Amino acid sequence: MELNELTITKAIVEGFFQKFSSCLETDVAIVGGGPAGLVAGYFLARAGKKVVLYERKLSLGGGMWGGGMLFNEIVVQKTALPILDLFGIRWKKYDENHYSADSIEAVSTLISQAVKAGLTVFNCISAEDVLMREDRVIGLVINWSAVEIARLHVDPLSVRSRFVIDSTGHATEIVRIVQTKVPGSLNTPSGKLEGEKSMWADKAETLTLSNTREVFPGLYVAGMSANATYGGPRMGPIFGGMLMSGQKVAEQIIRAL
């Protein structure tokens, strides 16, 4: 049978429409496709929850692809090895608490396993606002990233979810939106975004887990977003905290659903 250009177009348009329509209402919407968001999506999907992830860029993986300063190796601590083993990511021992892995294998495996577990991903889509009802986040307002980049005056669309995860990293995009729209309402010491502190890898990795929590009704933070929200330091190219934070936020939301 001859390949037909119109049939190719129909298959893409109809397939995307069906996928997008099925995700207008979900249990969880994740914003940010870095390691924390991907791991959260994996565990939520594996638990049978309807979960969607929005990533503003064309590719997922956040800063993990480049390892440290474009040296495409990453480091994780010993406590994160069970997650690497679960995903089938190979690692090498450097010393008793530092283990390295190929960043390309790590990212590509996280993406593949998360999608195969049932996570639906929409790339090139940004969240520009949240849906709010009585001081609770109940969804997202989304638009194509290209619209934002081109500065086009195009109204967005809305999607609903029972919970939202901000895993946008240093940018803390969703937390910043809520802070702007509902000043002083965050579950932080000041009621505001505390801000990211300078590099301190050991402390940052510990705080990433303790800062992974609900920061506003219906809104959770994970990964570097958690540290930036609660005033923790950055950690650099060690990713164990990111992975474990993704698992922790998934477990918290599963209990809440």
Enumerate the predicted regions with their spans.
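N-terminal Rossmann-like FAD-binding beta1-loop-alpha1 element of flavoenzymes
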Residues: 19-52, 242, 250-254
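Feature captures the FAD/FMN-dependent oxidoreductase FAD-binding
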Residues: 88-163, 167
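A conserved FAD-binding loop/helix module that cradles the flavin
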Residues: 229-257
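Short hydrophobic core segments
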Residues: 29-31, 54, 158-170
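N-terminal glycine-rich dinucleotide-binding loop that anchors FAD/FMN and/or NAD(P) in oxidoreductases
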Residues: 66-90
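Flavin (primarily FAD) binding-site architecture
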Residues: 166-181
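Extreme N-terminal leader/targeting segments of oxidoreductases
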Residues: 1-28, 143-144, 192, 197-201, ...
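Glycine-rich FAD pyrophosphate-binding loop
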Residues: 45-65
